[in-house]
Each structure stands twice: as C-alpha cells, then as structure tokens.
Amino acid sequence: MVVRYSLLMKVSFAILIFLVGCNENATSSNDQYLTDPDISEQTKKPSRPIIDEKNKGVTDTSVTIEWDKIECEKNFSHYNVIVYRKDRIEDVITIRTRNNSVFIDDLKPNSQYSIDVSSCLHSACSESAKIEFITLNEIDYYHTTEIEKNVYGSLEGEVRFVQTHVISPEGRKNEPEIITGRDALILFKPSIKNSSSILMKIYSEDGLTSKVVMKSPSMLPKTDQPIDIDENNKVVSYSNSYWSAEIPWNKMKSGMSLHFEDENGNLGIIESERIKFSAPSELIIQNIDLGMLYKPRGRNIVIKELERTAVDYFQKVPVSKLIFSDYTPIHFEKITLPNGSVYTEKSADIGGWHQGDMREAVGKALVSTGINNANLGIVASSGYSQQYNRLTNHITAHTNIGYYNNGVVVHGGSGGGGIVTLENTLHNEWSHELGHNYGLGHYVAGGTSHGPDTSWGWDGYYKRFIANFDWKRSPQSNIRPDNQEVVKPFMDKYTYLWDAMSGGYDHQNGIISRYTLHHPYVARIIQDWLKNGAVVINNDYMVWDELKNIYVYKGTNFKVPIKKGVPVVTILGVYDPDKINPSQLYPPTYSNYGNIFDLEKPRSESSLKGWQYVKDVNYLDRVNTHWHTMLVNRKEEKICRFSYLSPKGKKFEFLGYEDIENKICTGSRSIHYLEDGKKNPIESKYNDYFLLSIDGDGEISYVPDSTIGESKICSLKMSGTVYGAGFIKGNSCRQIDGVFMNGFQWAFTLNQSGVNSTYTWSNECVLKIKDKDNNIESISIPNYRIEKNQSNKIHLNISREKPIIDINVYCGEHELTSIKVSDNPDIKLLKGPIIVGQEHGYTSYEPKLPSGWFKHYDNFEPKNEINHELGKMRVNDNDEYICRFNFSDSDREMKFVGYVSQLSESKYICTGGSEIYYKKNDINIELSSKENDFEWLSVRDKNLIGSKIEFDNNKTLCVLDNRSFYGAGYLDENNRCTQDRQIHWSNGKQWLFSTYKTMTYH
C-alpha cells in the first residue's frame, strides 16, 4: 500500500529479494518478549531495521535502499517507509510493504531526501531507521531513447545484451552479435514504468535453468567516468530506466530464451529465435621483447602487466576466451640474414620506425612468423617469408630495438598477417595494429567515429560501462576524412571517440581502459574474422558451424598438436642447405604456453644411402629407405642398375626398373639391345642388381662403360608408353648405342618436356637437440632452399621437460651451425599464460594482497603472480617497488617513501638509494628502514578504481617518471611533488619537483 501526499511524485517499490511470507510458527531469537506469554500484546515491538548502505543506489531521479529483513518474527505485519524531500516537507511518500527493499522513481535531481523505515507487528511498529541521500545532478545518456520493442506479452519492452558493447539480441550488421560462452549483462526496459520488481528467468532448450532478481534502474552499474570531474561537467550515467541482471558464460548459448515477470504477475518473453548467437571465438596473443645488436628495452607493458592488459583487452575484442602469453626476451648479439649478410656490431641498413632490414628479417619474419609457425608444427620456411599460415587465431606481438648504420632505432607501428610490431603496447598503437590482423584497413567505411547512435562498451571485470566519448578532451566535432559526416559532441561537452583504425586516442580514457573502444561496426568485422579461426578440441581442429551452433571437424593438412598450451622451448635460426650462405642458431626463447607436435624424424636414421646391392637389402631397409623412382606406364617404379653382357660379349651398365615380383632389374619388353639385327631382352639375373636410395651426398652418377666414363643419370617422366633411364651426354639423355625402344635408339634431348635431368642425393638436413641427460632428439628439416635466392629459417617448439644443452644443424655429413645452451634466468620471470573468459573468468587478475599500504610480513615475497599488484617507480631505468617507513632523527618522526632493495633471500629494506638523503645540521643521513620493517604498496582495489593513492594523512602520492631523477612523495599546496623539507637530492637541493605523475587504484 502506498499513500501519496504529493501528486507530483510517482512511487514504485521494489522487491530485490522475493519473499513468500513468514512462517507464523517461527520465533525471533533476538526478541525475547515475543515468546513471553505474560507480556501484553500491546507492549510488543519488533526489531528496528538495519539499513544496508552498500546496497543503496541513487541516480538523478530514483533511489533503491535495502535493509535486513525480519527473520519471520511472530505476528510480523509489514514495513513502513516514509520518504520526504528536505526542502519540500509536504512532498511525503508513505509506502507499506512486506519486502525488505524499496525502489522509488521520479525524484527531483540534485535534491536532498530522507527515508525512515520501521518494522511493524500487527499491534506496534519499531523505532525508525533513517537514511539521507542527495539525488545526483547527472546526465542520462539514453534517457530520450525510444524503446525498440523485442520483448512481448503483458510486460512488453526492450532487452539489450551487454558484452564488449551494448547490443540488440537479433544480430545487426552494424554491431557485434552475442558471443556464445561469454558473460553478459542483461538490460531490460519495460514499455510502461509501473514495475516495482522484476524477476528474470533463463530458459534453455532443456527448460528453466535459473532465476535472477533484476536490479532496479537506480542500481545500474556505473561508468568509467573519471572521479575528478571538471566543475563544468556533470556525472554521466548510461541510463536511468534499465533493469539489469547478469548471466554467466555457461548459460550464454543458442536456444536460450528470457522471461521477465513483475510483482503483479505480468510476463514478457523474448524467444530463442530472436536471440542470435555468434561463435565462442578464442584468441591467442604471444608477446616478446627483442633487441637486435642492442639490449632489449624492457619496456613492454603488456609483458610487465600481463594480467591487467589481458583483462583490459578482453573487454575490447569479441571473443569467448583470450590467452595472453609471454616469451623470454631475446638479445641478438650476432645476426645472420637470409641473404648471407652477417652483423656483429650494427646493420649496414638505415633503420626507422617503419624500416630496417633487421626489422623485417628478424623481428617480423624470424620471430613473429616463426613463433606462429612453431605453434602449427611448421619447422621451417623461406628466410624472408612472413606468410601467415592462419588456422587458429594465433598472433605474435613484439617490441623491437636495433642498432643500424644511423644509430639505435626503436621499431613500431605495424601489424597484419599474424605479426604485430610495436613501440608502445598500450593505447591505440596496440588496438590499431592488432586491428590490421583482423583484416581491417585504415579508415574503415571512410572513417568511423562514435556518435549518439553507436553503443557504449562494457567492462565485465569492473562492472562498469565504457563511454563512447572522450572524458577529458575539449569538445569538438568529428569530421570524417571524406567530409561526408560530422559528429557533434555529446551535450556540447564531450567529443565522441574515433575508432582505433581511424585515429583512436593515445591516452587512457576514463578510469579503467588503456585500449581503444572499437566502433560497433568495426567490432562486427573483427568478430567475423575471429569466428573463422579453428580451435583444438579432442585432438582435432574444429570450426564453428553457424547453422548448427556447434563446433564441427575441419579438414586440414596442418599437424594437430600432441600437447596444447604447455611450457615450450622455441628454437629459431637461419640455415642454408646449399652451404653457400652462413647459418646461425640463436639462443632459444621460452614460453609457458605453446603447442608440441610429433615432428618428422630424419630418414637417415634408418635409411640406406646410395646404390644398394639388392641381396643386402632386408625388409626393414626397404620400408625405411626412400628410393629413387621413374615413371613406367603411369606407375612409379624403383630405379635399378645391373651389369649387362650381350650374347656376343658387349658389357655395359644398364639402368632399368625393378620387377619386384620376379626379383629382376629390367627394361621390359619395350626396351631391347640390338646386336647383329637381333633384339635381345635386357634384364638382370635373379636378385642380382642395385637399387638407388634418395639419401646420400652430391650428384648421382654411374659408369655406363669404360669408354664413356662416369656420367650423371637422367630419366623420363612421360605419361605414355615411353619410359626408361640413362646417362647424360651432350644435350641428350641416352642409353648405350644399341639400346632401342619401339624401334628407335633410346635417346631424348634434355630440353624437352618429361626429361628429368637433375638427380642429386637428398643430402638430408637434420636439427639435433641434446638434453642434459645426453639424449638426442633429431628432427627433419627441408634439405633444399624453399626460395632459391635465400636461406631457410628454423622455427619449432620442443618440450621444456628436460633442459637442453646443445643444438646442431646438419645437412648430410656437414655441420652448418651449432649453439650451446645455458640456463636462462628469465624463465622464472614468465607470467603467462593469462587466460580470460569461459571457465577461467577473471581469476588470474583477482587481488591477492590487501589494498593500499600494508606491513611487510614473514615469508612475503614479491613473486610473479602478485607483482602486478604492487606499486612501482622508475629508479635508474629499473622498475622498483614503492615502500614506506617511519624515519626518526631523535627530534622528530616522519613518513618516508622510497623503494625496496633486496639484501638477500627474504630480506628487504626500504631505502632512498644513493641519491636521496635526510639533511640535518649539514650532515647527510642515509634513508633506510630496518630489515623487513616497512610497508609495501598494493595498487589493486576494485572499489577504489580511479581513486588517487594517498601518501599519508589525505596527502596524494606522487611519483617521478624520468631518467634524471627518481623518488616518490606527496603533493603540497602548490601541486608540487615533495617530501619532508629536510629530504634532499644528491645535488644538495630539496627534493621538490613540478613534473610528476599521481597513482590511482586499478
């Protein structure tokens, strides 16, 4: 029951937790007189409600409050709720309800209200609990948007799905489709605003799966708007009219329908046919830092903050699962290019952001393409090739620096074909260059700017909307390059964002995201590209069938990994099977996420070589050896050789084919030796001939007779009845004079089609890997140049189960290159893989440390899995952990912020280092804590996201970020970064700076 004392106000009360009423037989353990029969009914009073501040939601026009419900007190009747506006006492709302929450709509913005709540028995009410609030002075982004009805029934309205973007359920061409297997926020707006509570029921093809009480519009999640709002701007909310609820990833699949019911029994339904699901795509991004003839920069933020960046980028790309993995950095101290050039000091080329021979051959071709190929079981490719053998959605991003003829050059700014070359792994450079990998060009559709008709984004980890405009940039219109469209700023206050492929933005927009929010039209193109990628399921490659909404088998020539997503050693190098260019193996790089394959073993381990006398060839030799063949009547037959003696004593070596059934070497009936006009068949004695193995060294030859001498062999590859093999003489492939076929001397010019004049031994190439137990694994690699004008490159994964100590490359008996492998300490610093989505959720990013400053405790170590939670500052080109301790000089005590220095295992101090000291009476005093007696700083806190971190006593923490100075302090009244006035830099001046950065929680 609601009694209104103002006609200007409309009220609806919400049931956030559906109650079916109390059990009248129950009693309250907190109210002893309720069970005392001697106390008069008139004196009984129920418990006073306790209002839950955490579950309070306030917008500009509505409020939701919740309180502890009465646990079935005997004779419980209802709650009385009285709402009034402080500056207009006559506007009073009285609500009578049995539910322990209330939703009140149509309030006045920027006004102060008070709410009294009391619990009542049939005879008396408790004392009132009071809460006051001020409605917000905010802008609702979608407050004027008309309903696009897609929910039908007595509770009709509009439903929208929120994943990377706020989208319609039916699947439109200009926005992403719903992602199968990914969490979603559901927004529901009834056509008529008279509901006080809404229950959402989730149905699958098997029936009802779950029920969720929707949150009222005043409890809609917040946005990514910065906390320090400009005084000229208002708080912006996404909407003040949507009810919301979350659906977990495992219920998000085809066949789902949603039912919405209000407290009056009204029902609205969106059927499964109106909900279009797309593929549960997966994306793998490998990350590596490179230095070519120069030490790697060590500034790859994705690698340094793998957990945070993975979660952040997951919000921008329409996938069901995202995997970020890191490789150990590579310092190329010597470089061999596929053209044979060798660099030990600097490249002979001119380097630039977009140019340089090492940039192309090493960073892109060898490393990024190499890692991609290694994870598909491809062991080698041509040296300069950047071919993207795309099967799965696997991309390798690298940061790269090189020493060139014009000096040290940082590369960046390119992407595509499974490769990303970056200087900055944050902001638009990352989003833009990854976009090229998804098939996107510059200025998609002539240039895509967000606008009033494009959707907002969503961060599923922080549960906040991501605005499609710039929070801090001065308002201006966006004009497409073709001048065909002008997008004016929102409310003349906020400039709309450009898509990543149309300029994007190179700063953090809002309190959450460091990557660009894609325009929904562009996001759909990305989604269409991603859904074509295969995944490995049950030892097969599978692709998504959009008609069946299931994964189906994909036929492919690529190897299927025998182990997926395991720790690997990736071996990279350059080799020349022709032994013309120099070859080189590079120090291996390591990752915790890669694929292992059953790679081809060398034939030479079990294969015979050269000419083999048939009596010495056993069954296994025949099976394991690859034999040279020729075409006989459209069938490949083994080439053989034997000594022929004519009836009149002519002796020569004859090349024929093996008749395996009769165990002879023959030329068949079509080939004969003509002597004195008589045709003599040419065939060996039983089991008395030689077979020719592919394996060996050099060109293949034989001696037809003593007068001709050693000659190279040749054969015919013709489809008709002409066949045979012989020797090369002049410009012909021939046999001994007198050998005829079909009435003609067996002789053919070399330049005609079907004559094979190049026979060489295979000169098999092998990569040999020795582990610490001296076990050797041999892997076959191509024994020929894949491209004639360049060396090949090697790229393959092996297991990390046993450390390796030696790697060698052989072609035939020749060792082309080798490398001794030592322990790599960077393996311990690997953080990956970070897997986001599906059953993994955001577990890899959940905080493990307390928020803010915390005391060092026994056995605490800043390990890989938590170091992203700790605050850091740059000290002499290194990132050091921020710390704080109490410093005393006998006269006074103060807080000092420095950095952590490790003395030995499990022993740390907080220090100012060699450049910062405390000055007293012209004496410089070292700033250093006692051993393990200081505080660390944790910068992770979901609830404080975007809030500035305090130094102490409400002073804002500030940190220097330049090469010349270091340190941390607090902001003084003049907005300078300082510490105590007696803290000085080594130049004798007070530690006081006007250039700094503040730190916020994330």
Curated annotation (Swiss-Prot):
Q: Which cofactor does it need?
A: Zn(2+)
Its GO biological process annotations read:
proteolysis
Q: Name one GO molecular function term.
A: metal ion binding
- State the compartments where it is located: Cell membrane
Matching SUPFAM superfamilies = Fibronectin type III (SSF49265)
What does the record give as the active site?
Answer: E433
What EC number(s) are associated with this protein in UniProt?
3.4.24.-
Q: Where is the signal peptide?
A: 1-21
Task: Enumerate the spans annotated as Peptidase M66 domain.
Answer: 282-536
Provide this UniProt record's keywords sorted from A to Z.
Answer: Cell membrane, Hydrolase, Lipoprotein, Membrane, Metal-binding, Metalloprotease, Palmitate, Protease, Signal, Zinc
Binding of Zn(2+), residues: H432, H436, H442
Lipid tethering residues (S-diacylglycerol cysteine):
C22
Query: Pfam families of this UniProt entry?
Result: fn3, Peptidase_M66, TagA
| Residue stretches making up the Fibronectin type-III domain | 45-139
Residues annotated for lipidation of the kind N-palmitoyl cysteine are C22
Q: Does the keyword Membrane apply?
A: yes
Q: What is this protein called?
A: ToxR-activated gene A lipoprotein
Tell me which species this is from. Vibrio cholerae serotype O1 (strain ATCC 39541 / Classical Ogawa 395 / O395)
